[in-house]
Structure formats: C-alpha cells, structure tokens
UniProtKB/Swiss-Prot annotation:
NCBIfam families in alphabetical order: rplM_bact (TIGR01066)
Role description: This protein is one of the early assembly proteins of the 50S ribosomal subunit, although it is not seen to bind rRNA by itself. It is important during the early stages of 50S assembly.
Name under which the protein is recorded: Large ribosomal subunit protein uL13
Gene that encodes the chain: rplM
InterPro entries in the record: Ribosomal_uL13 (IPR005822), Ribosomal_uL13_bac-type (IPR005823), Ribosomal_uL13_sf (IPR036899)
Pfam family, one: Ribosomal_L13
GO terms, biological process: negative regulation of translation; translation
Entry keyword set: Ribonucleoprotein, Ribosomal protein
Alphabetized GO MF terms: mRNA binding; structural constituent of ribosome
Family: Belongs to the universal ribosomal protein uL13 family.
Claim: Ribosomal protein is one of the keywords in the record: yes
Gene3D superfamilies for the chain: Ribosomal protein L13 (3.90.1180.10)
SUPFAM superfamilies from the UniProt entry: Ribosomal protein L13
Amino acid sequence: MATFSQKPAEVVKKWVLIDAEGLVVGRLASLVANRLRGKHKATFTPHVDDGDNVIIINADKVVLTGKKYTDKKYYWHTGHPGGIKERTARQILEGRFPERVLEKAIERMIPRGPLGRRQMKNLRVNVGPNHQHEAQQPEVLDVAALNRKNKGNA
C-alpha cells in the first residue's frame, strides 16, 4: 500500500468552539495547535493545511499555573536601539488585549513559515462569551472533560 498524501482539494474542515474559562493556558494552546495543524486526523499531511477552524471564547478567563501570572514575561523589540520592552502575563491579561496571552501561546506552538501563518488564520479568539460564527454551527469541544489537569485551580 502506498503512502497516503492528501491533496488540498480533498480537505474537509470542521468548526470547533472552545470555552477557555478556567482552562490552563499551555494545555489549551497545545490542544488547539494540534487541531489547527490537523494532527488529530488520520489524513494528516505535513505540507497541507488540513486543520479545523477553531473559535475560542472567554479567552480573558484563562488560568496560568504556579507563579507564571506574576513572573512570566513577554518580550518584544521596537526596532530602535535599546528598544527591548517587557510585560508580565498579569499586565497583559488585565490590559486592553487579554486574548494575546492565548494567541501567542498557540502561535509559538505552530511551525513558523507560510503554512503556519495560513493555519493561524483559522483561529478566532474572543474575549467575551460571544462570537460571530453561529452560522457555521461550530461543534462544542469540552477541553476540561478531556483531562482533569486541563482545568485550573484559580
């Protein structure tokens, strides 16, 4: 039997809805990254965008374990000399765009390159309980029920 290689025209994408309230960031990000890449499917082909469309709601209510809430730092550079900047996870989660903690965690688990950028476009992260994709009839995925460690204590 020959090795199976999926063609882009044969891809069937599902819509998945995940409620992130009370879930641990890293565990959720790992699961979502695998869904976006399509690694949960038997038809996975490394060079084809085979993943599902993922909608995450309540991204501002995620949980960080240990002291990461106060100690984890996010760095970026402005491009100017001496322009290294940093913020803690707490500052970001309490700031204007709290969904970025989850977005960055997922983005950093997906390979960098043209295919990774295309797969990241299949991710929609929302701060509140509402989303604009009711018409796609997303299937609800209960991440907390998959493993007891997925749910945070806080």
